[in-house]
Structure formats: C-alpha cells, structure tokens
A protein has these predicted regions:
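Active-site entrance/lid segments in N-terminal catalytic domains of soluble metabolic enzymes
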Residues: 1-65, 69, 81-84
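Alpha-helix-loop-beta-strand connector modules within alpha/beta enzyme cores
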Residues: 35-53, 86-113
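Conserved, mostly hydrophobic/aromatic
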Residues: 45, 67, 75, 98, ...
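Glycine-rich, proline-tolerant flexible connector loops at the mouths of alpha/beta enzymes
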Residues: 26, 79-89, 143-147
C-alpha cells in the first residue's frame, strides 16, 4: 500500500537493522486506529453531530443489542468479506440471529441493520432483505466487474 505522503512505509519502525520490515504498511495504518474507543464514547459522538451514527464491523448478536442500547441509529454487520477472520459467522447468519432476537424483544423496528460481506449476487440481496436487513453493501463483484470490463462490466453485474 502506498500513500502519496509516505514514500517508503517499511521504515515506520525506524532505520535500525533489527526492525521487522514485513509489517510496515500494517503498522503504519494501525497507528490511525484509536484502541481506547468504547461504548461510552458514543455520547461524545452524539454531542458533535446531528447525523445518524452507525457502527460498522458488528459480528455478534450481543454487540448489535448493545449498539441499540447505546442509542446508535444502525449497525453494519460485517466480517470484511471473510478475509480478516475466517472463523467468524457469515454476516447473513448473524443477521438472522440478530433479527430474531430483536423481534423477540420487540426491538426490531428501532434500529437500521445493514450487512456487508459475502454478498455476491442478487439472490444474496433478496435473502438479506427478507431476513430484515435495511440494506446491503456490495463491493467485490462490482470491483471485479469494473476492473475487468469497465462501466459495461458494472452495468452487466447490476
């Protein structure tokens, strides 16, 4: 990965010979992630914006329930296409479990629920909507179509 402001990310760890250069880009990118964020920070986000706040990357029903309890407007159930953690449930399974739990608690109309990851065709979109998703994020099929066939490929994919 390259950034126009940083020419060689392999030196993020310093210039000494013992530095592990194999994680340069990953280490540089992770420096932008605030690991101290927690559920209590949602109140601060609410104080600085009137825009709806959604939480992306939800992978468990319990976290979806917490997002609702902390007043988030919606969530995006996502496992990053399964390429980050291959042992987690697919978003469509988490969606089914979450919507069932929300319906049981009469909370299913209080939060928008999107899914992202693992969606490859129109039938996946229909299944997600039928299971209660507000919307579906689709990336990879359109990225491949665009990179291979350009605008025509995206039109055909749609």
């Amino acid at each position: 990965m390259r950034s126009k402001n940083i020419q060689d990310l392999s030196h993020v760890q310093g210039d000494d010979e013992d530095a592990d250069r194999s994680q340069g880009a990953a280490r540089a990118i992770s420096s932008f992630i605030d690991t101290s964020l927690n559920w209590n920070d949602i109140a601060w986000f609410r104080s600085i914006t009137k825009m709806p706040i959604l939480l992306k990357g939800v992978q468990r029903v319990e976290d979806g329930i917490l997002a609702l309890k902390y007043g988030l407007d919606g969530i995006v159930i996502s496992n990053h296409g399964g390429r980050q953690l291959d042992l987690v449930k697919p978003p469509i399974e988490v969606l089914a479990e979450l919507q069932s739990t929300l319906r049981m608690r009469k909370m299913d109309k209080k939060m928008e629920v999107f899914i992202d990851g693992g969606v490859r065709r129109g039938s996946d979109v229909i299944k997600a909507i039928a299971l209660g998703a507000t919307g579906v994020g689709i990336g990879r099929p359109f990225l491949y179509a665009m990179s291979t066939y350009g605008d025509h490929g995206v039109s055909k994919a749609i």
